């Protein structure tokens, strides 16, 4: 028995399913989840001392790679001054100033402790601002595990083959309207009929929880136009895409300004954190300025602020995102070439430093239906073959992959060598 197998068996005694987030259980790929004990640069090391090139990156935050010395130093220095105060700090203001300077639409920011808190709070704020109850989301898009958003969601719910979650009252779900991603005509039709009840549209500008599906040409522009027309708040969920697709997030890359945005992952440099913000007029409705309540004991935690500030400053250097995107493109091109040579139907998608891998004969992946039509069984085999070759991918056919600035030519070669053997075995 491997160390991971032993630990997984022990974990299941007191932890439901043996994991603290469902996708980690390897349910969709089979086998025993790997238990990690160390990470450095582009690599993770499991409890059996096996080393893997990491394309999960803690599900997105580790854009600098694991254990960047400057980030670790900033956290160590803050540790000397305390773990948490439950009171304002200078770093919170510094973080708000930096986020507003980097993201085109941000005028005010509120820090929270997770991406789920950020999206939940942004939706509450949109409802308070507009006085309306309904929200529009899109099939396969995941915005955290708050009740009203677990309707036809992506991420772990797709991994488990569950369209929504038990425990969500029908009275909550009835306020959530779900439309096809990348279908602006469906948005136009729905708003023409019920716009007076809709507080907001929330969307991942790049859908990163049904693998990685970029927006179709005109889709984000159409959302902005329709929200302006009907007085609906447009929320970009940039928990995944923020500071990764570009320094200014997906909104900076595509040139579309939402009314509110949510962030997480990179903004905390690997520490638990989230934030939401946007137009000053809307943010002024939140307590203590306005009637919309939101609070959090650990919001603006100084350790998270220290790690996040250092990370954002490091990724702001000229050329950083160009290098990151170039590596991602070269890696995906290499995978496609090897799949084609082996005669394996395979499609990749990319948005900056995030990517999707699909075993599909489609020309492109544009819709939720395209994602669901891909061969999840073949991905399952590919995942384990890549593990055997020393490459750790997301353990689900419905999760995006992530690269870091620590990935270089050596990691690229390991990845492509493993893929060549894997595709040959999949013929």
Curated annotation (Swiss-Prot):
Q: What GO terms fall under cellular component here? A: cytoplasm
Catalysed transformations (reactions) = (S)-4-amino-5-oxopentanoate = 5-aminolevulinate
Any one GO molecular-function label of the UniProt entry: glutamate-1-semialdehyde 2,1-aminomutase activity
Pathway the protein acts in? Porphyrin-containing compound metabolism; protoporphyrin-IX biosynthesis; 5-aminolevulinate from L-glutamyl-tRNA(Glu): step 2/2
Give the required cofactors: pyridoxal 5'-phosphate
Q: Name the source's superkingdom.
A: Bacteria
Q: Which SUPFAM superfamilies match?
A: PLP-dependent transferases
Keywords, A to Z?
Answer: Cytoplasm, Isomerase, Porphyrin biosynthesis, Pyridoxal phosphate
- Please name the GO terms of the biological process aspect recorded for this protein, alphabetically: protoporphyrinogen IX biosynthetic process
Q: Which residues carry this modification: N6-(pyridoxal phosphate)lysine?
A: 265
Q: Identify the EC number(s).
A: 5.4.3.8
Q: Where in the cell is it found?
A: Cytoplasm
**What NCBIfam families has UniProt attached to this entry?**
hemL, PRK00062.1
**Could you describe the subunit structure of this protein?**
Homodimer.
Protein family: Belongs to the class-III pyridoxal-phosphate-dependent aminotransferase family. HemL subfamily.
Q: What is the designated name of this protein? A: Glutamate-1-semialdehyde 2,1-aminomutase
């Amino acid at each position: 028995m491997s160390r991971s197998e032993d630990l997984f068996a022990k974990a299941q005694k007191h932890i439901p399913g043996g994991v603290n987030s469902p996708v980690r259980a390897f349910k969709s790929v089979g086998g025993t989840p790997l238990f990690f004990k160390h990470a450095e640069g582009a690599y993770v090391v499991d409890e059996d001392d096996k080393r893997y090139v990491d394309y999960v990156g803690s599900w997105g935050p580790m854009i600098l790679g694991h254990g960047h010395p400057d980030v670790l130093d900033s956290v160590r220095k803050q540790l000397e001054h305390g773990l948490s105060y439950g009171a304002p700090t200078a770093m919170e203001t510094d973080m708000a100033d930096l986020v507003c300077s980097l993201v085109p639409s941000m005028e005010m920011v509120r820090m929270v402790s997770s991406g789920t808190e950020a999206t939940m709070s942004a939706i509450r704020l949109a409802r308070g601002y507009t006085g309306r109850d309904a929200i529009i989301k899109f099939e396969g898009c995941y915005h955290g595990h708050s009740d009203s958003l677990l309707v036809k969601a992506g991420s772990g719910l797709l991994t488990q083959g569950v369209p929504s979650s038990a425990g969500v009252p029908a009275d909550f779900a009835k306020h959530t309207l779900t439309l096809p991603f990348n279908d602006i005509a469906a948005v136009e039709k729905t708003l023409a009929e019920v716009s007076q009840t809709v507080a907001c549209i929330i969307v991942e500008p790049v859908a990163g929880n049904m693998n990685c599906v970029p927006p179709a040409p005109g889709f984000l522009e159409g959302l902005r136009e329709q929200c302006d027309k009907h007085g609906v708040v447009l929320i970009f969920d940039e928990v995944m895409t923020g500071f990764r697709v570009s320094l200014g997030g997906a909104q900076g890359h595509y040139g579309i300004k939402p009314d509110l945005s949510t962030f997480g992952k990179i903004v905390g440099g690997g520490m638990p954190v989230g934030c939401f913000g946007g137009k000053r007029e809307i943010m002024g409705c939140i307590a203590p300025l306005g009637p919309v309540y939101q609070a959090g004991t650990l919001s603006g935690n100084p350790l998270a602020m220290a790690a996040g500030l250092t990370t954002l400053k490091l990724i702001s250097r000229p050329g950083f995102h160009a290098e990151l995107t170039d590596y991602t493109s070269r890696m995906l091109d290499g995978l496609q070439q090897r799949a084609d040579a082996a005669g394996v139907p395979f499609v990749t998608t990319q948005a900056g430093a995030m990517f999707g891998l699909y075993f599909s004969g489609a020309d492109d992946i544009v819709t939720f239906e395209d994602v669901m039509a891909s061969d999840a069984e073949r991905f399952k085999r590919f995942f384990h073959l890549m593990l055997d070759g020393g490459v750790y991918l997301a353990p689900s056919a419905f999760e995006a992959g992530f690269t870091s600035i620590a990935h270089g030519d050596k990691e690229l070669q390991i990845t492509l060598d493993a893929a060549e053997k894997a595709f040959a075995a999949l013929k």
